[in-house]
Structures are given as structure tokens and as C-alpha cells.
Amino acid sequence: MDENIIINILRKEMMPGLGVTEPASIALSSAKAYEVIGGEIKNIKIIADPGLFKNAFSCAIPGTKEVGNEMAALLGAICGDASLGLECLRKIKKEDVSKAKTMLDKIDIEIKSQTEGLYVESIVTTNNGIGRTIIRYKHDNIVLVEKNNKILYQKENTLNKSNNFSQEAIDSKKITEMKLDEIVEFVNNVNYEKIEFLLESIKMNKKLSEKGLEGLGIGLGKLILESCNENNYELYAEALTCSAIDARVSGATVPAMTVTGSGNHGIITTLPLLAIKEKKNLNNEVLARSIALSYIINIYIKEFSGKLSAFCGCAVAAGTGVSAGICYLLGGSLKEIENTIKNMASNITGMICTGGNLACSLKANTGVKAAFLSAKMALNNIVIPNKCGIVSNSIEDTMKNIGRIAYPGMMETDKEILNIMIESSK
């Protein structure tokens, strides 16, 4: 495959995001809908797919102590800046939060069950009329903008049901046409200057981690770091990862570099690699190459599991990606990278997702632990053999199988998780 296609996919899948991407997507949608209509807000209606609704259900809004779909939508309309994309709530103020709290009776949330892929629609009614937006397939992909039933903007071929979802999704799908040996060949041989941009994710996510080490969230990252000695890069990796996620899900106003639409995925696919790099005094080039491998494997799996799913994509998809990156950084061969992925597939695949919340760092820690264990096993010639569980004869089919566990495998599980969350909130 043309290396420029791979590089473009990596660039496309990377994006700064403030807070968890699902409430950010809701806020962006309502911000844009209000932007086109203006005036005094009378009502806001949000229609979201179950996965997006679940992920935003109990997640903190950046810069506030508030959580959930309703507050995300209200704040988007009240103070959101749609031009900032997933950082649309960057300018939030205390008075905006106070105003939103007085307007909770003006918002309605509807779950759109019969839809494929990510979906969020905002209908903002004011004294000036109605503003409406639809976001599809990607968290910031606005495909429709209307003002008083007049279409102001519409992306072609994105409102119809399609197995390929959108042109952007087709691009990333090309990753799944590659064999693992082709992926590793790209990682080894691509000109370093062409992938140096991947290090931007390290700078951004490290700042978030430093914020989390102040004890935000459940304080898991801080707790782990306290028991970490100077040369233990595994515990250091867990601490960096968990503290960044602790900060993110608790509403810290520091952006993460998202990948495949998720800040947590972006954190897990990068920070464990930074930990190894720092403790072993490796250079930036080998770090960038390991990130490229980590990202590509994560993207590969996510193309089959979907952007949002019943399993914890952070621990499973991103965790598998970073396991390959860990093996690579520790000098692993192509065969050892393959065996690392087999070991991951056999371990935590199926861990459930209960949305973006304070428990995310706990699941992330499990994913990072499993990633290091899988790599160490492979580097010591220990591997789960083919035809054992979901491990297939080819590593490509094995990665596909990981995704299949989520979609279609766990669709009913996802519904029940959402039912439990809604019942528990009453």
C-alpha cells in the first residue's frame, strides 16, 4: 500500500479533544445548531445513538463538576464555539454552568436505536425559529445544518445508510487491507520525518497525565506512581496512563490527542511507550515508529468493532495496539509482535464498557498490564496457539475476531448495560 495513504489515515485519526469525546460531540452539535438560529432558547432536543448516549451518560464536562448528555447539550448551546470542534467548550465560564442548571427542563433526550455508527442530532428551538444539525460516523463530522427547515450545509452521500458509512471511514478501512508484515515493514522503513508528527500526541497526553497526578478522578495514577521505583517502566507506564485518564474523565480543562475518536484510546496507545522511552533513554525516532504501529493496530481492530461498542475499546483495541508497540520498542521481531497480539486477543477481549466515567482508569490499567504481559510472554516464546479460542490461523483474522466480539457479538450486552445504567440513575 502507498505509504502516503497510511500517513494520511494516521493524520486523520489524530485530533485534539477536550474532555471525553461523546459529550464533546453532543456539545458541538448543539453549539452549531444554536449558532445558525440564535435567540432565546426555548427547547433543545438531542437524538443520539445508544453508544454515544452511554458514553456521555456519567462523564464529566470539562471545566465543570457537571456530568451527562443534558448538560453537554445545554452548555454547547449556551457557550459552545463550534469553530473549535471537539474543544468547543474551551471558553466555558461559571455563569454558563449556572444558566444551564436553570434550563434542565428545556431539554429532551431521545435514543435512536435503529442506526448504524455514531449519530447525534440537535434541534434547538428559540424565539427566532429552529436550528438543526446532524453529526455522523465521526465525533466532529457535521453532515447537516438547517435553519428553519432550510438546508445551509449538507455533506453528500453521508445521510444514507451504507456499509462503508462515509468516505472518511472508507479511507481508514484501507488499513484492514494490509497484512501484519506490511504494517511492520511500513513502520520500519517510512522516513522518520513523515511520522514525526505522531510525537505531538506525546506532548499533549503527557501534560494531561501531569494534571492527573495532582490526584484528579479516583487518583489511581497518583497511587501507582507512589509505589513505582526509578527503573520500573511498567508501573510508570500504568501511572502515566491512569493519571491522564483520571484527569480526562473528571473534567480537566487540558486536551488529549484522540485517536479513532477517543482520547482514552489516544492515551493508552501512546503513554506506555513514552514510559519505556524515558526509562530506557531511547530516541524519538524509535518512539514515533512504535506509536505508528500502536495506532495502526488499534485502527485495524476499531474498523471491525466500531467507534463505540459494548467492549472497552480502550483496554481491548488500544491495549492491543500498544502491546504491539511495546514489543517493538523492546526489540521484538515480526513474529514476536504477532504473538503479542495473539496473547492479547486471548486475555481481556470482552471487557465491558459502561461509558466514559471514573472507572475508565481502572480498565485502562488492566489493559496496560495485559499489554506488557502479552509482550513479555511473546519475547520469551510463550504464545497462545492458533485455533485456541478466538486466535485464528492468520493474525489478520485474529484482529478481526477481536472486533467481531464487540460487533455483532456483544450488541445485546450493550443494550443491557445501557438499561442498567438508566435504571440505576432513577
From Swiss-Prot:
InterPro entries named in the record: Ser_deHydtase-like_asu, UPF0597
Alphabetized GO MF terms: L-cysteine desulfhydrase activity
Pfam families for this protein: SDH_alpha
One record GO biological process: L-cysteine catabolic process to pyruvate
PANTHER family in UniProt: UPF0597 PROTEIN YHAM (PTHR30501:SF2)
Stated family: Belongs to the UPF0597 family.
Protein's name in the database: UPF0597 protein CLD_2825
